[in-house]
């Protein structure tokens, strides 16, 4: 086939990529939208983004992709009234660039920090809801996050409501130092007061739930659920291996392995969560009458 005036010659006489080919390749790349194709972190299946349902679940292995809090909210509940959306961190350690990073993420996520809290309902079952957002500094636990979750439990205790909390976190936020770690104890105390009032607390562990969140309120629930293949643990895999100087099993920190050892009550697919939560909330409310 003869080469036309506008055709692209892939290689020159020296068998190297031609300048015209590089330009054409760049133009083609610019026409492909970002996130058009995704690779499942668990089974490594290549996924066409437009074929994913609203639940953002891998059709091959049921792994739930990491999604923003408001995305989860859109299919989880029937109504929602947001709490404490104006709370702001004061950058207590004056960490360089931290305030700018927070401001940028606030614009992107429409959240003031890494958790969305409020009063929600599913089929007339009213409850207090918290959803941690892995797109906001990996759902890390800072002072505002801890304060919002604490206030959520205090509201639930006062109004005698169950609490449902979706966890997704890399742990305590390093930019806030010891003040971040203090949130673990503060939230746990609010949970203790909620439990003392005889009220139900349901946790749903999503990918990833690690660090100080796992070491505190993620494991304090009366009922602990988890999404398929969610990473759940305290220290990261590399930290563990560097500490004990040996490899750990690939599934050691998987939700399935933790279920096997009795720390999780049930693995629930994302598309089944709303129905299961409705049943649990209804059962809990009857038991509490």
Swiss-Prot record:
Recorded GO cellular component terms are:
acetyl-CoA carboxylase complex
Identify the metabolic or biological route this protein is part of.
Answer: Lipid metabolism; malonyl-CoA biosynthesis; malonyl-CoA from acetyl-CoA: step 1/1
Example GO molecular function term? zinc ion binding
Q: Which family does it belong to?
A: Belongs to the AccD/PCCB family.
Gene3D superfamilies in UniProt: 2-enoyl-CoA Hydratase, Chain A, domain 1
Q: Which cysteines are joined by disulfide bonds?
A: none
How would you summarize the oligomeric state and partners of this protein? Acetyl-CoA carboxylase is a heterohexamer composed of biotin carboxyl carrier protein (AccB), biotin carboxylase (AccC) and two subunits each of ACCase subunit alpha (AccA) and ACCase subunit beta (AccD).
Q: Which reaction does it catalyse?
A: N(6)-carboxybiotinyl-L-lysyl-[protein] + acetyl-CoA = N(6)-biotinyl-L-lysyl-[protein] + malonyl-CoA
What's a BP term from Gene Ontology annotated to this protein? fatty acid biosynthetic process
Superkingdom of the source species: Bacteria
The residues that the entry says bind Zn(2+) are 40, 43, 58, 61
Q: Which cofactor does it need?
A: Zn(2+)
Which locations, inside or outside the cell, does it occupy?
Cytoplasm
Keyword Flavoprotein among record annotations = no
Q: Give the EC number(s) listed in the UniProt record.
A: 2.1.3.15
Q: What does this protein do?
A: Component of the acetyl coenzyme A carboxylase (ACC) complex. Biotin carboxylase (BC) catalyzes the carboxylation of biotin on its carrier protein (BCCP) and then the CO(2) group is transferred by the transcarboxylase to acetyl-CoA to form malonyl-CoA.
Positions of C4-type zinc fingers? 40-61
Q: Lipid biosynthesis as a keyword?
A: yes
Query: What protein name is recorded for this chain?
Result: Acetyl-coenzyme A carboxylase carboxyl transferase subunit beta
Co-factor note (free text) = Binds 1 zinc ion per subunit.
Q: Provide the CoA carboxyltransferase N-terminal domain boundaries.
A: 36-289
Keywords from UniProt, A to Z, are: ATP-binding, Cytoplasm, Fatty acid biosynthesis, Fatty acid metabolism, Lipid biosynthesis, Lipid metabolism, Metal-binding, Nucleotide-binding, Transferase, Zinc, Zinc-finger
Which EC class heads this enzyme's classification? transferase
């Amino acid at each position: 086939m003869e080469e036309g005036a506008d055709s692209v010659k892939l290689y020159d006489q020296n068998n190297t990529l031609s300048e015209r080919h590089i330009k054409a390749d760049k133009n083609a790349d610019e026409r492909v939208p970002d996130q058009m194709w995704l690779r499942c972190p668990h089974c490594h299946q290549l996924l066409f983004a437009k074929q994913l349902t609203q639940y953002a679940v891998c059709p091959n292995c049921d792994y739930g992709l990491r999604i923003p809090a408001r995305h989860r909210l859109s299919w989880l509940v029937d109504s929602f009234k947001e709490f404490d959306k104006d709370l702001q961190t004061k950058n207590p350690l004056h960490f360089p660039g931290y305030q700018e990073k927070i401001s940028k993420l606030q614009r992107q996520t429409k959240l003031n920090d890494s958790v969305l809290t409020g009063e929600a309902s599913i089929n007339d079952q009213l409850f207090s809801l918290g959803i941690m957002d892995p797109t906001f500094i990996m759902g890390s636990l800072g002072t505002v996050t801890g304060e919002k979750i604490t206030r959520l439990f205090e509201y639930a205790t006062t109004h005698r409501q169950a609490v449902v909390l979706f966890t997704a976190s890399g742990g305590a936020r390093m930019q806030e130092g010891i003040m971040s770690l203090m949130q673990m104890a503060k939230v746990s105390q609010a949970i203790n007061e909620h439990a003392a009032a005889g009220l139900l607390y349901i946790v749903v562990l999503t990918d990833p739930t690690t660090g100080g969140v796992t070491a505190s309120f993620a494991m304090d629930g009366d009922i602990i659920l988890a999404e398929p293949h969610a990473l759940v643990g305290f220290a990261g895999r590399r930290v563990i291996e560097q500490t004990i100087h040996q490899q750990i099993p690939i599934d050691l920190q998987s939700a399935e392995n933790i279920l096997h050892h009795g720390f999780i009550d049930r693995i629930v697919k994302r598309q089944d969560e709303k129905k299961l939560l409705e049943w649990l909330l209804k059962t809990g409310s009857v038991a509490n009458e």
